UniProtKB/Swiss-Prot annotation:
Keywords: Acetylation, Carbohydrate metabolism, Glycogen metabolism, Phosphoprotein, Protein phosphatase inhibitor. This is Protein phosphatase inhibitor 2. It comes from the Eukaryota. One of its GO terms (biological process) is glycogen metabolic process. Phosphorylation on Ser-44 by ATM activates PP1 by dissociating the PP1-PPP1R2 complex. Phosphorylation on Thr-73 by GSK3 activates PP1 by dissociating the PP1-PPP1R2 complex.
C-alpha cells in the first residue's frame, strides 16, 4: 500500500510549475493589501545599540593595551655641596667665556655626587659578601670595564694597524730606492769597466 501511494504522487521538479505561480498570485490577491510602511518595517532591521555597546565594548575591556606599573626614571638633583659650582640662580647672569672657563675648571676636579654615593654603597655591600662572591664581583666589574672600553680598544687597534701599514709602506719604498741605487751603481761600474776595456783595446791597437 505504501508503494501504491508513492507511485500515485506526482514527481516534483526543480523548476516551478505554471500552476504553482498562479496559485500564489491568487493567494496574494485574497490577502488585504498592506501599506508601504508595513512592508518597509518588515524588511528593515532594528538595531539594539545599547546591546551592541554592552557586547562589543564592555567597561572592563582593555583592548590589548598594557598598563605599565614601574617607577619613573630617577632624576638626581644637584646636592647642596655643588651649589657653588653650578647654581640655578646664576642662570640669570650673562655667560661669558671667562666665567664658563672658571666653572669648567672648578667642576673638572670634582666627581658627581651620585657616583661617589654608588662607590660608597658598593663598598658597604662588599663587607657582606663572602670571599668567593667578592672575587666573582671583582671579575665581573673588570669584564664590564673591558666591555665598555671595547670601542676605544678597537679604535686604538685600527690606529696601530694603519701606523704599521704606513711604516711597512715606507720600508718597502726605502728598500726599493736602495735597490734602485745599488742597481745604478752596478750599471755605472759595469759601464765604466766596459769603457776602460774599450780604451784599453784602442791603446793596444
Amino acid at each position: 500500500m505504501a508503494a501504491s501511494t508513492a507511485s500515485h504522487r506526482p514527481i516534483k521538479g526543480i523548476l516551478k510549475n505554471k500552476t504553482s505561480t498562479t496559485s500564489s498570485v491568487v493567494a496574494s490577491a485574497e490577502q488585504p493589501r498592506r501599506t508601504v510602511e508595513e512592508e518597509l518595517s518588515k524588511k528593515s532591521q532594528k538595531w539594539d545599540e545599547m546591546n551592541i555597546l554592552a557586547t562589543y565594548h564592555p567597561a572592563d575591556k582593555d583592548y590589548g593595551l598594557m598598563k605599565i606599573d614601574e617607577p619613573d626614571t630617577p632624576y638626581h638633583n644637584m646636592i647642596g655641596d655643588d651649589e657653588d659650582v653650578c647654581s640655578d640662580s646664576e642662570g640669570n647672569e650673562v655667560m661669558t667665556p671667562e666665567i664658563l672657563a672658571k666653572k669648567l675648571a672648578a667642576a673638572e676636579g670634582s666627581e658627581p655626587k651620585f657616583r661617589t654615593r654608588e662607590q660608597e654603597s658598593s663598598g658597604e655591600e662588599d663587607n657582606d659578601l663572602s670571599p668567593e662572591e667578592r672575587e666573582k664581583k671583582r671579575q665581573f666589574e673588570m669584564k664590564r670595564k673591558l666591555h665598555y672600553n671595547e670601542g676605544l680598544n678597537i679604535k686604538l687597534a685600527r690606529q696601530l694597524i694603519s701606523k704599521d701599514l704606513h711604516d711597512d709602506d715606507e720600508d718597502e719604498e726605502m728598500s726599493e730606492t736602495a735597490d734602485a741605487d745599488s742597481m745604478n751603481i752596478e750599471e755605472s761600474n759595469q759601464g765604466s769597466t766596459a769603457g776602460d776595456h774599450l780604451q784599453h783595446k784602442s791603446q793596444s791597437s
